A protein has these predicted regions:
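An alpha-helical, amphipathic repeat domain used for nucleic-acid recognition
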Residues: 1-193
């Protein structure tokens, strides 16, 4: 690429070449990622394979299959050291989503994206006593819709809109209509839901 047509101050940034992939580098990338974020085995596998693919794209002679084996070795080592634990990851994520009022469908989709099995997600939801009515109330409270609107007139005017919001969030129509029938709930009733 020629830079003659660019003034000195407007030259495009040159992309830095990817660093060489080695087993130790993959381990360091994995540790750095786990230091910042809890992860599932499958999710970390994707992160590490993405790095391998970036390096292989710039260096066609690089043996990707060997690097993929290094990735598997790193994952196995991290599991033995309990740095990676899908059960722990699932529990943390399910608890977080339940605390902010997310429906089961949303939780299942998000965790499936991270490589967690459906059976494991369902088991965790059952262990944590998932209650769709409670979750819908939490979401309604957070968004100040339905029974948490400030006055009765606003509730009547926005009933359909509020129902649509909860249904789009993933709650069943029966649960949503039940929530909409609840009388006004003042904001100071925090934990009585």
């Amino acid at each position: 690429m020629s830079y003659e047509n660019y003034p000195e101050t407007e030259q495009p940034k040159r992309k830095r070449p990817a660093k060489k992939i080695t087993p130790q580098r993959l381990k360091n990338i994995g540790l750095y990622s786990l230091k910042r974020f809890e992860s599932s085995v499958e999710n970390l596998r994707l992160v590490l394979q993405k790095r391998v693919n970036q390096y292989a794209k710039e260096n066609p002679e690089f043996n990707k299959q060997e690097a993929y084996q290094w990735v598997e070795n790193v994952l196995t080592e991290f599991e033995k050291l309990h740095y990676l634990d899908d059960d722990r990851f699932t529990e943390i994520k399910v608890r977080h989503y339940l605390s902010i009022g997310k429906p089961a469908r949303y939780i299942q989709n998000k965790l499936r994206e991270k490589g967690i099995a459906n059976a494991q997600i369902t088991e965790m939801l059952e262990d944590l006593d998932y209650n769709p009515r409670e979750m819908a109330l939490k979401l309604a409270k957070r968004k100040k819709i339905g029974p948490f609107r400030s006055d009765e007139e606003a509730r009547k005017l926005n009933r359909q809109k509020d129902m649509a919001t909860l249904i789009r969030a993933g709650f069943d129509y029966d649960v949503v209509s039940e929530i909409m029938e609840i009388d006004f709930i003042a904001d100071d009733k925090d934990d009585d839901l």
